[in-house]
Amino acid sequence: MALKAYSLARDGALHLTPHFRVREFACRDGSDPIFVEEELAALLEAIRLHFGCPVAITSGFRTAAHNASIPGASPHSQHLYGRAADFRVEGVRVA
């Protein structure tokens, strides 16, 4: 696994996979840099290909401050290390 750091300003439009760009993993507080585990991007790409539908990342990398502002978020969340993402698959309902 390779954890990489990206600049939102410089690398935001960069494709990590055919369907995911760096900016989609950005912390919602707009901070820079963004950390993304390459394996996470590849896994999300595989999910998108499996369902054949767009996948929207609702939470990717989080700074410690942003993570602390989320009710119920673990202080040891893998989001802090670019190893987790919350997402939804368009058109797919979760039972």
Kindly give the residue locations of the regions a language model identified.
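Cell-envelope/glycan interface and biosynthesis
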Residues: 2-95
